[in-house]
């Protein structure tokens, strides 16, 4: 663990200690008198709360927020797609049809390409560097300004670790191997593979397993090792390539329409932002553990873990 990572996580741990004291002090009814009636936000998530990693982060954030506010501010989790399609949640926030959302920043790239820097930057920063940039560096202002232009308050609320490199029905060791191969990847990583001769196949995450199983695509990315293992990709009998060059890290956001967010009492807004910082600390510490366990599980089930060749990575 690097000094930089230690400093970042210790700093975020300090945030946890700070609000822990605030919760104790805030348990008294008199301390809540200035914020009015209790509030429950309906928050649709892009991630199944029962899945590891980003799904767990949804539940952790809502529990933290409830404890911090002594129950005055709570969040009702709405399952993916229940009120709005996952990819359209930002539009639903802007229109006011959705009260709050917990999502991947990359979905917002359809509104402004700059969001791709936070959601899926090939060969980009790792999770610790991403967290530092979006919390304390120039990324903080870039992220905020991009959402401001849409009339949305976007609070960084988690940092996902690296994805797996993908599952493939064919060997990919050289640039020539990519010619005419049909692959599922994201927007920016798709530009990389198409330049190498591959055909980009846009597929919703929920359809990738079936298409890969049926041979309708030749391979591509799904998610992190923990997520891939939980979704049963080991049953395909295909090799799993590492590392996930296409997405070394990704920011998760809490979203509300700005005018709606600013109507919340100031203590609630502060608690949301502090709970999100705490959630970033949690995701940074949680990810390496569950990814290592997932890779061991995949190996035990017979999956061959392959490293990308030096020719491709260099």
Language-model-detected regions and their locations in the chain:
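Bacterial N-terminal signal peptides that target proteins for export
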Residues: 1-11
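Polar helix-capping/helix-linker motif
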Residues: 136-137
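N-terminal secretory/targeting leader peptides
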Residues: 14, 24-130, 140-314
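Bacterial N-terminal signal peptides
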Residues: 10-19
């Amino acid at each position: 663990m690097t000094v930089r990572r230690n400093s970042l996580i210790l700093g975020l741990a300090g945030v946890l200690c700070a609000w822990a004291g605030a919760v104790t002090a805030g348990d008294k009814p008199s301390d809540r008198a200035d914020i009015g009636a209790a509030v429950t936000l309906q928050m649709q998530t892009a991630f199944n709360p029962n899945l590891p990693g980003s799904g767990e982060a949804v539940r952790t954030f809502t529990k933290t927020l409830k404890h911090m506010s002594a129950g005055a501010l709570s969040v009702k989790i709405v399952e993916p797609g229940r009120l709005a399609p996952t990819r359209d949640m930002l539009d639903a926030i802007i229109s006011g049809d959705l009260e709050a959302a917990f999502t991947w920043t990359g979905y917002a790239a359809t509104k402004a390409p700059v969001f791709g820097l936070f959601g899926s930057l090939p060969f980009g920063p790792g999770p610790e560097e991403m967290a530092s940039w979006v919390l304390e560096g120039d990324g903080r202002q870039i992220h905020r300004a991009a959402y401001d232009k849409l009339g949305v308050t976007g609070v960084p609320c988690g940092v996902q670790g690296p994805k797996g490199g993908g599952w493939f029905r064919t060997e990919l060791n050289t640039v020539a191997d990519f010619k005419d191969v049909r692959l599922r990847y994201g927007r920016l990583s798709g530009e990389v593979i198409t330049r190498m001769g591959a055909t980009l196949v846009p597929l919703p995450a929920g359809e990738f397993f079936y298409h890969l199983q049926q041979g309708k695509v030749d391979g591509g990315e799904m998610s992190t090792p923990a997520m891939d293992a939980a979704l049963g990709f080991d049953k395909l009998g295909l090799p799993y390539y590492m590392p996930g060059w296409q997405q070394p890290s990704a920011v998760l956001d809490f979203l509300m329409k700005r005018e709606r967010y600013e109507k919340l009492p100031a203590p609630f807004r502060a608690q949301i932002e502090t709970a999100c910082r705490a959630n970033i600390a949690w995701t940074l510490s949680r990810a390496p553990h569950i990814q290592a366990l997932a890779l061991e599980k995949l190996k035990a089930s017979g999956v061959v873990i392959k490293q990308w060749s030096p020719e491709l990575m260099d």
